[in-house]
């Protein structure tokens, strides 16, 4: 196979549930201080599901939606890889269940399985797919990356940081979002900031303060790794946030995204402390990126103020889905990319920096550039001529209208549904979900039953066509 170029994301879409709870209403129900969820966390609404939907049904819906909206031939997919930490079977992969969609069209030749590492699995699945297309093993077909989760927490302070959603990406040559080859900063270490050792429960064990410190430390490390590679390739250019038009972050909650961009500005200062625009940060020069810098409120205050204008233009356009749907774990940073494409019209030639983080921990800083030129030379490969502009992708995904058509559920009903979901997850044996199908939209897969062999059976809610 002839070596290809301009590899990246050709299309991207997301499935999120029809139901959501409003964070202001949840705050009142939880009897916490005003603004704790909306200002303290920076969240607006939160998606959730009952016992009728699981990671398999959501992933299947996301894939089928992508294939249908873009009229993609199922035979044109040669790799399908899933990134998720929502585990419903200790052996059977989510990818194997998605195969039922491809078997229907006679395609059983698809490489890839599931990748697991907290919220980082989708990024690893993406990297694997990019490298597959770059390799001698590539057979000329597209890759499909499916990534997302159902994030649920027990009652308490962490519950409003939940969410749900699954992103699907079509990866191939001659892409619209072209990844920068050789530019990637990665940091990994062994730490117990967030983990799920109790397989009878969906709820994680979380050390909130440690997790924030780990996130920011990983960001610091990835910044330095990326900077080193960037400057080795671009001899005359120094790496800084000025090198990019937009930045997307993994978003447990939006306030952490704000702090993270401010942290990158602080890293810029440490690399160039004599720049006059950073004069307010000079007292922190010797603090560097040590542990004390993660809990220094004065430093936070100054960096947030310094970075605010840039945050509004460079980062805020990518936060729509995370603020509206909450944390989709593996899908979070990619929902940020889709939000950006949906919010900004003129993205041609723009450069985007992306930070992906998964607890435990694994993190990467990487980048892509956008090419909306429909007249590009496309003789690179036989049938890989699929091309959509970022405006096309935004219109096809139609996330703003879809968000507005969701069903708002009261905090009382939200709590009741999650209680049912918790009890259902702990049950072993044949059972039929009891949650209503009224909240399942047409064309969505749902869990019909679990039989006596504990095999899960899914159905798609019929699409009823109206006739005159």
Swiss-Prot record:
Disulphide-bridged cysteine pairs: none
Keywords tagged on the record: Lipid biosynthesis, Lipid metabolism, Steroid biosynthesis, Steroid metabolism, Sterol biosynthesis, Sterol metabolism, Transferase
Pathway(s): Metabolic intermediate biosynthesis; (R)-mevalonate biosynthesis; (R)-mevalonate from acetyl-CoA: step 2/3
E.C. designation(s): 2.3.3.10
Matches recorded under SUPFAM superfamilies: Thiolase-like
Listed GO biological process terms: acetyl-CoA metabolic process; farnesyl diphosphate biosynthetic process, mevalonate pathway; macropinocytosis; sterol biosynthetic process
Role summary: Condenses acetyl-CoA with acetoacetyl-CoA to form HMG-CoA, which is the substrate for HMG-CoA reductase.
Protein name: Hydroxymethylglutaryl-CoA synthase B
Species of origin: Dictyostelium discoideum
């Amino acid at each position: 196979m002839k070596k290809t170029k301009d590899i990246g994301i050709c299309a991207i879409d997301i499935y999120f549930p029809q139901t959501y709870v409003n964070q202001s209403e949840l705050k009142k129900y939880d009897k916490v201080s005003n603004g704790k969820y909306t200002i303290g966390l920076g969240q607006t609404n939160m998606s959730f599901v009952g016992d009728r939907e699981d990671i398999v049904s959501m992933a299947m819906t996301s894939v089928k939606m992508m294939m249908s909206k873009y009229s993609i031939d199922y035979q044109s997919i040669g790799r399908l890889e899933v990134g998720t930490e929502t585990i419903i079977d200790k052996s059977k992969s989510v990818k194997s269940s998605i195969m039922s969609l491809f078997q229907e069209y006679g395609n059983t030749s698809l490489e890839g399985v599931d990748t697991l590492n907290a919220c980082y699995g989708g990024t690893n699945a993406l990297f694997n797919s990019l490298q597959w297309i770059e390799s001698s093993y590539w057979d000329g077909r597209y890759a499909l990356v499916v990534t997302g989760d159902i994030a649920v927490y027990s009652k308490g302070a962490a519950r409003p940081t939940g969410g749900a959603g699954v992103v699907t990406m079509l990866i191939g040559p001659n892409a619209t979002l072209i990844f920068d080859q050789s530019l990637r900063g990665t940091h990994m270490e062994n730490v117990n900031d967030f983990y799920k050792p109790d397989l009878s429960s969906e709820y994680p064990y979380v050390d909130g303060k440690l997790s924030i410190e780990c996130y920011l430390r990983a960001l610091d490390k990835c910044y330095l790794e990326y900077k080193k590679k960037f400057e080795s390739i671009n001899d005359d250019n120094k790496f800084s946030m000025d090198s990019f038009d937009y930045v997307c972050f993994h978003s447990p909650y939006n306030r952490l995204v704000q702090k993270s961009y401010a942290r990158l500005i602080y890293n810029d200062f440490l690399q160039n402390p004599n720049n006059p625009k950073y004069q307010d940060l000079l007292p922190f020069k010797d603090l560097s990126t040590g542990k004390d810098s993660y809990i220094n409120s004065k430093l936070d205050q100054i960096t947030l103020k310094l970075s605010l204008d840039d945050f509004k233009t460079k980062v805020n356009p990518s936060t729509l889905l995370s603020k509206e749907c909450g944390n989709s774990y593996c899908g979070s940073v990619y929902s940020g990319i889709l939000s950006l494409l949906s919010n900004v019209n003129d993205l041609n030639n723009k450069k985007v920096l992306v930070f992906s983080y998964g607890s435990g921990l694994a993190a990467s800083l990487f980048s892509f550039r956008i090419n909306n030129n429909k007249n590009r030379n496309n003789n690179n490969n036989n049938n890989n001529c699929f091309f959509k502009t970022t405006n096309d992708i935004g219109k096809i995904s139609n996330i703003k209208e879809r968000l507005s058509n969701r069903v708002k559920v009261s905090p009382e009903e939200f709590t009741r549904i999650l209680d049912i979901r918790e009890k259902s997850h702990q049950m072993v044996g044949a059972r039929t979900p009891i949650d209503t199908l009224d909240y399942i939209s047409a064309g969505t897969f749902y869990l019909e039953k679990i039989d006596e062999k504990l095999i899960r059976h899914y159905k798609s809610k019929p699409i009823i066509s109206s006739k005159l």
